[in-house]
């Protein structure tokens, strides 16, 4: 069951590049794979990152905990055979022009701030739930998505998967 949930999260993250035909078909060559970064690497952050290596290259990882960051940099390097850059300050990730998208799995109260800054920096975003803590934050996200035209995906597994709905029905 855990594997399924992690796989569903990775599929959700992958779907941020299937929003429009040019993106869905734009990454055909191994030389033209999307470049990702993950911000927040504990538990769910690493789970979605580790399931995403098959469709993206990770150029950077960010986490405020040096121990968590170091361990995940090592695991990423072993998996993709290239060491990602590491940052304690997520803003350094957003400053990079080579990163196409970020996956955000920080504590909940950081989600909106980082997601907005990422879109304004020209990044597509996959963000774990809950996306926002207030209605005003939700409206801000909506406005920034429309303003920037960025692709935005929220991880909603366990809330929308068919197995969950089936269990609720019985």
Describe the predicted segments one by one.
Residues 83-104:
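A structured beta-alpha segment of the ubiquitous adenosine-cofactor-binding alpha/beta core
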Residues 58-75:
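NAD(P)-binding Rossmann-fold cofactor-contacting core
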Residues 16-50, 54:
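C-terminal segment of N-terminal export signals and the immediately downstream linker at the start
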